[in-house]
UniProtKB/Swiss-Prot annotation:
GO molecular function terms attached to this record: FMN binding
Protein family according to the UniProt entry: Belongs to the NrdI family.
Chain's role: Probably involved in ribonucleotide reductase function.
Name of the protein this chain belongs to: Protein NrdI
InterPro entries: Flavoprotein-like_sf (IPR029039), RNR_Ib_NrdI_bac (IPR020852), RNR_NrdI (IPR004465)
Top-level division of the source organism's lineage: Bacteria
BP-aspect Gene Ontology terms: protein modification process
Gene name linked to the record: nrdI
Pfam family, one: Flavodoxin_NdrI
Length: 140
């Protein structure tokens, strides 16, 4: 089971974050056909917004989420961005969360810090434990 799916652009910031995070993850391709997932996952994505917030969600992420199966298995989103862009910082997370009715679990800047990595690891562990507990309760 892959519990993380991520997209990283040519800048590689999100890829560097994911490498340091050290958890199994599926990387979305930039141009190839989108994969289809078969288990619940958290999406990690950068933000690409213009000054008005348009285009915040990268096109490969949109393509991936346009697959209804992929969208149905999405459980949360972690978004990256650059604080220099003010209100559009990590905006992709807010857009995806609203459209897919999932929580934004965390926001990080550029390739993240060691504090971000520690918080993400701990937060994801708590999140998946809560998801497991919820699944067990609904199956009883």
């Amino acid at each position: 089971m892959v519990g993380l799916v991520y997209y990283s652009s040519r800048s590689g910031n999100t890829a560097r974050l994911m490498e340091r995070l050290g958890l199994e993850a599926l990387r979305l391709p930039q141009t190839e056909p989108s994969p289809e997932v078969d288990a619940p996952y958290v999406l990690v994505t950068p933000t690409f917004a213009d000054g008005e917030g348009r285009g915040a969600v990268p096109k490969p992420v949109i393509k991936f989420l346009n697959n209804s199966r992929n969208r149905a298995l999405l459980r949360g989103v972690i978004a990256g961005g650059n604080r220099n862009f003010g209100d559009t910082f990590a905006l992709a997370g807010d857009v995806i969360a609203k459209k897919c009715n999932v929580p934004v679990l965390y926001r990080f800047e550029l390739a993240g810090t060691e504090t971000d990595i520690a918080r993400m690891r701990a937060g994801l562990a708590r999140f998946w434990a809560a998801q497991e507990q919820q699944t067990c309760l609904t199956q009883a």
